[in-house]
């Protein structure tokens, strides 16, 4: 008979500075002390998705755990007068919550943490402080450093995610708290602007300068702080947990998604711990599924609006088994070091390491007769390098008419309908998108691992952006996005090249896909993906204060024998098969 489950609401957790957090505790009142699973959330402990989206507390109680879901400082039911700032201070508070949970009479003193997206941040921040009772963490879809792994990408600002997440996920509760504290009149302009931005997010994305975000005035100071601190700034180093990774002794179950906006941050944390060879290096596990940032069936069949993967996996059961092993000393089968979902053949694969040792970084070279514009042009991808001169390809980048974002690793309005593997055919009809495609494949081509493009660019602008996408073209012409990247080319790089091309390496992060016979491998090259990334203004520093500051640029991609531009793919040889597919 299933035990009765007690849910204690708004249990106080006092912090050392006197602030009181509020938590909901799920437990079996008839049981003795048990290990605790802690989620420290910025997303409301009363919200169904926040509570049940990663682990069902009732199932966890059935498996012998106590579950504590605590609202973060400055969020929802918890105390704290200052506006919530993502990353800042979450480590001290999360570590205090770990200590509190370990000291309760219903606790065995062993604590594990879990949670996705921003709820993964306090896990890494707690790891920096290593409270004695913390035994393991299971961060989903998150990062341990926040400039390159969260806010910026390739030097560009991740406008779509940063602004929409701030507007939709953070600002409403921040406005509620500020209004309760100061009165409605004090924040009426912000309230009006927020309602307008949520109603018409495209207008919010298009505002210039980027700091012009009236919907966040007085309630979300982090947004302008982020814009004021470019990647590599000491501001980010102070927030990062990266330095703690090499010395950690904690086992970590890393959960990532091919179409998740934080995939690069997920992989960077895993790789950093493994590369350091420290006490926890062999106790890391990595799972990568075909998931987006927000999937309606996150661990069931993963689906975008246009393509579906039969990716059902009992991720909840895997997590509970992991926690039983590391908090209770339970036996049972070990997870493989790496488990990845391979798209195309649509199967789970167990691997020994990440990146795969047997994968070979293989260039596919760009060729054309000088007219690779759009999917109707003459751009080709080939394993054969260019011989002698080739005419370059040129397009006009206009920041007033940027290439629109369509799917991929995004978090934009209506995320279920605008993320994941979406057809890029309409994008590829544009003349400001260069398209290079292989011949139809005669056999399967397996690609698992990091992806990048090396491009040789001449620009008429003092500085610019280069974007790249890897696409799987089906025999019926549909062109599904696998991964993408951006690289902000600086004025110093352009000046150093003189009249010649700048060598630009664009990091597309990673994918796991088998291109099936009859399919084609495709690379798209352009200079924008808006609103995923902010528009480069064509100015020396890339910024604009008003639309009239936006300057078009003539972009030329060179691909001759002296400047061999290429898409570099991690090919898995067919004669060296992977381990057995996962059950």
Predicted features along the sequence, with ranges:
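Active-site-adjacent alpha-helix of alpha/beta-hydrolase-fold enzymes
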Residues: 264-284
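A catalytic-pocket lid/entrance helix-loop region that shapes and gates access to the active site
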Residues: 89, 114, 121-189, 258-259, ...
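Accessory cap/linker subdomain of secreted extracellular hydrolases
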Residues: 53-54, 62, 128-247
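N-terminal cap/lid segment of alpha/beta-hydrolase-fold proteins
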Residues: 1-30, 437, 441-443
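Glycine/threonine-rich phosphate-binding loop and adjacent beta-strand/alpha-helix elements that clamp
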Residues: 7-12, 303-304, 310-318, 327-583
